[in-house]
């Protein structure tokens, strides 16, 4: 069994459902401390965070990742126990195999190989690990970054191990992410009997024209780096459950995934104008989960693409599609940030898995990136 596979299995065996770490960071720290890293716990609330650094000279290269996982769902739907890692037909099964314990294992073994060969490498290497990525993400990476900034610790390069690959490892790399703006809209009417609509005011009927406008709205055209901004309704709740009662209010939850062509303030203003035009009695709450970020072509993107090409022969595609990541907290510091990890076809699904061979490829890619940036 390879060192990467062994470590990945040990991590998967830790039932670290967010915000629990369940011992993952301890396993990783043990391996990294043996390489000369210095560890520092930065726990906030019920969230475990750790910052491990080797060296004090610039440039500082950071591996960033999360040890928490989403709930596995019904265990009886899995081929294997979600927290008993098992290899079947060349695939490692278990919750977190692809998102992102496989990446974490590959990062550590990449460092072990790199430092064994280049013990006197240039610059510094660090790990930023949190158990609060799959949850609210308020006591995790963002708090560690704030602590580092307060004491003047500057990150130059950051590689986040999110599962970015589509069909084979390295075919897609994220060099940015869209912003995420969520909201909760409550429209109030007057409850009543469905047989007497003139004595009531149905908020669902009142809201329907506004929803049609919102769903058909073109918010922007996107640009060469980002697709157009999208608006999606995720939940609608209204009524008592009875078929003969007009509801007194309706609630919707929605989300914008937005490009750099528009700000979250502009989206808020546009939506409020649409709602006001319909003369609705409404209440609106906003939640900004993250602003869009983009890493421009530079030394990190060059190193990552060269490493992928050298190990796999693939010319990787850079993209900003997909969900948010903790890169949104690191990029505003001025760091170059990219994301590269395993194939994402099974993440957050029953029977999450990763190809065993891909773990070794990923470890080699990570090690090669370090060589390009810290020795050449």
Curated annotation (Swiss-Prot):
Gene Ontology terms for molecular function: acetylornithine deacetylase activity; cobalt ion binding; succinyl-diaminopimelate desuccinylase activity; zinc ion binding
Pathway membership of this protein?
Amino-acid biosynthesis; L-lysine biosynthesis via DAP pathway; LL-2,6-diaminopimelate from (S)-tetrahydrodipicolinate (succinylase route): step 3/3
What does the note under cofactor report?
Binds 2 Zn(2+) or Co(2+) ions per subunit.
Q: Does the keyword Hydrolase apply?
A: yes
Superkingdom of origin = Bacteria
Per the record's keyword annotation, is Metal-binding included, yes or no? yes
Similarity-based family: Belongs to the peptidase M20A family. DapE subfamily.
Q: What does this protein do?
A: Catalyzes the hydrolysis of N-succinyl-L,L-diaminopimelic acid (SDAP), forming succinate and LL-2,6-diaminopimelate (DAP), an intermediate involved in the bacterial biosynthesis of lysine and meso-diaminopimelic acid, an essential component of bacterial cell walls.
On subunit structure and binding partners, the annotation says:
Homodimer.
What protein name does the entry list? Answer: Succinyl-diaminopimelate desuccinylase
What is the native source organism of this protein?
A: Nitrosococcus oceani (strain ATCC 19707 / BCRC 17464 / JCM 30415 / NCIMB 11848 / C-107)
Taxonomic classification, please?
Answer: Bacteria, Pseudomonadati, Pseudomonadota, Gammaproteobacteria, Chromatiales
Its gene name is dapE
């Amino acid at each position: 069994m390879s060192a990467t596979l062994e470590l990945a299995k040990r991590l998967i065996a830790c039932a670290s459902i967010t915000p629990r770490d369940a011992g993952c960071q301890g396993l990783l720290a043990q391996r990294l401390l043996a390489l000369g890293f210095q560890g520092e716990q930065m726990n906030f609330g019920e969230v475990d965070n750790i910052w491990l650094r080797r060296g004090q000279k610039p440039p500082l290269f950071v591996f960033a990742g999360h040890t928490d996982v989403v709930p596995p769902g019904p265990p009886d739907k899995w081929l294997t126990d979600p927290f008993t890692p098992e290899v079947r037909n060349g695939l490692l099964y278990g919750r977190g195999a692809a998102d992102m314990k496989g990446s974490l294992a590959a990062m550590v073994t990449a460092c072990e190989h790199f430092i064994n060969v280049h013990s006197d490498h240039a610059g510094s290497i660090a790990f930023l690990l949190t158990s609060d990525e799959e949850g609210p993400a308020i006591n995790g990476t963002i708090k560690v970054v704030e602590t580092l900034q307060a004491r003047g610790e500057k990150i130059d390069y950051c590689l986040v191990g999110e599962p970015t690959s589509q069909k084979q490892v390295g075919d897609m790399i994220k060099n940015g992410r869209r912003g995420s703006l969520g909201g909760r809209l409550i429209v109030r009417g007057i409850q009543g009997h469905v047989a007497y609509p003139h004595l009531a005011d149905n908020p669902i009927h009142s809201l329907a024209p506004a929803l049609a406008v919102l769903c058909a709205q073109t918010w922007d055209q996107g640009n060469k780096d980002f697709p157009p901004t999208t608006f999606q309704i995720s939940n609608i709740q209204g009524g008592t459950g009875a078929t003969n009662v007009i509801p007194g209010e309706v609630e919707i939850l929605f989300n914008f995934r937005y490009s750099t062509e528009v700000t979250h303030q502009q989206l808020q203003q546009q939506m409020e104008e649409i709602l006001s035009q319909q003369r609705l009695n409404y209440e609106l709450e906003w939640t900004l989960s993250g602003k869009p970020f983009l890493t421009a072509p530079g030394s990190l993107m060059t190193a990552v693409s060269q490493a992928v090409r050298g190990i796999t022969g693939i010319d990787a595609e850079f993209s900003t599609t997909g969900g948010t990541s903790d890169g949104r907290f690191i990029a505003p510091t001025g760091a170059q940030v990219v994301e590269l990890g395993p194939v994402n076809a099974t993440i957050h699904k029953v029977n999450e898995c990763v190809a065993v061979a891909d773990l070794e490829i990923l470890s080699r890619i990570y090690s090669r990136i370090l060589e390009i940036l810290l020795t050449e």
